[in-house]
Amino acid sequence: MKNFLLQFLAFSTLSLLGMGCSTTAQLSPPTSASLSASPRIQQLTEKERLRWSHLDPIHDTVPGMSVDRAYTEVVKKRKGSPVVVAIIDSGIDLAHEDLKDLLWKNPGEIAGDGLDNDQNGYIDDVHGYNFLGESYHEQMEFVRIVSKKLGDFNLQQKASAHLEPKLTEAKTAVLQYQQIEQLVRMAHQNIQKKLGKESYKLEDLEKYEPQSVEEEQVLGLLTQVMAMGQDIPSALADLQEGIHYYQSQLEYNLNLGFDGRKPVGDNPYDIKDLGYGNGNASHQLEEESHGTHVAGILAANRSTKKGVKGVAENVKLMALRTVPDGDEYDKDIALAIRYAVDQGAKVINASFGKKFSPNASWVQDALRYAAAKDVLFVHAAGNDGLDLDLPENSNYPNDAYSLSGTPSENNYLSVGALTPSYGPDMIASFSNYGKKGVDLFAPGDEIYSTLPNSNYGVEGGTSMAAPAVAGMAAMIRSLYPQLTAVQVKRIILDSGLSVPMKVRVGEQELALSELCGSGKIANLYTALLLAEQVATGK
């Protein structure tokens, strides 16, 4: 029993809770030489932790984007022109207190009349469009490839090889989480009886003298859990969430017999089968919070004193619901990109991605269309902790569509994630990387933003880093509308800050220049200064 507990504790410590502008000459922009070569030692305050992504690397020794400094010293009272930003995601809470006044409105559509008033092929698309209709749960793409025999034999073999370990992992995880949950629950109930009270603190456990080996094991288990900073009821809730997560994978995401597309009613493998979905671009369930969190990072209302402030102002948010609880369909993404472009979006945020893409050419064609129409596409690099430059670590969509041999000259920008820890651990352990596959890094871990039903909370992922950079792009395009998408991308990359220390990726310590194309971290303050220079020629 003791050996099992030791194995459990080793496992649980990792996974239990894991689930009028001044001229540039008058300003002193941060430079690579300005950044500290030493990591930050002191802990962030609670206030700093909730808004670390807006703090300044020099003044605060945090790898934030200097958003506060940019507004204070550069933007000041300047008002740019409105910029439409499309959020291709899981839908946005259109009634959220920090987002409802920022929604893009289709001028040619009449809400709720059931007609396609502007004849664009989409009925009641007032604030965007819902390409998923009433669907929510969905298979992963490699599961669809196997179950529907998509693509050639080679693709099917690769997908099958990817599926088997995922199934094993999910089945094993369900059993492990159930065993852990049962152990913690029994230990919790036993110690409640021994102490004679429902709730207790870590100090109570430390004072208690165990009367047997079993009690010693119980104390050790509960002490380790509580030493991680949570009370036992919260830990049990997290364990139950883990059980639900992996059970859901087995029931839906990895289930060869599940058909999540049935409620939509279209053929997802026929790009010409149109007219599906509906005009309700909001989230459908409370747990469908991803798109709302992304939208808040990018553009939560800066003129109120409510929950959060977004990176950008003067933004009109276009909601395009295409990302289910599972992998998105290439058809939906391609059509959503074209919709965004045709309806006037100048920036598209894409906080999604997948390893397999049987109809990648549809998305690539849409990205070329966006490039031709001067639209910047900002994509999350992915959360697998992989080197995207290795051929086996594919991530879609990517910039393979580009006709230019120079990545800096296309309209695709890939963003990796930073943690709030300035120092060797500033690259998020989950973030993908690669000199070719990732352009730069931005804040993406422990990010506080909007959640459905006018709530707020912390989430992490490259999904959170992408909208931070998309917000930068929106600000530049708002203040300097004469700049092209390619120029905006180049400004964001060139104005980033180099970090004078090596950072950890797995077991390695590497320079940031080895992990992304620019070798830099995103910074709004320096980006606006450079945009001013490029726009004015000064």
Label each residue range with its predicted role.
Residues Y71-K79, E286-E288, K309-A312, D327-N349, ...:
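Mature extracellular/periplasmic domains of secretome proteins
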Residues D89, G382, G461:
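Active-site glycine-centered loops adjacent to acidic/histidine catalytic or metal-binding residues
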Residues S22-S28:
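Bacterial lipoprotein signal-peptidase II cleavage site
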Residues V375, N395, D399-S478, Q482, ...:
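Extracellular S/T/G-rich loop segment that most often corresponds to the catalytic His/Ser-adjacent loop
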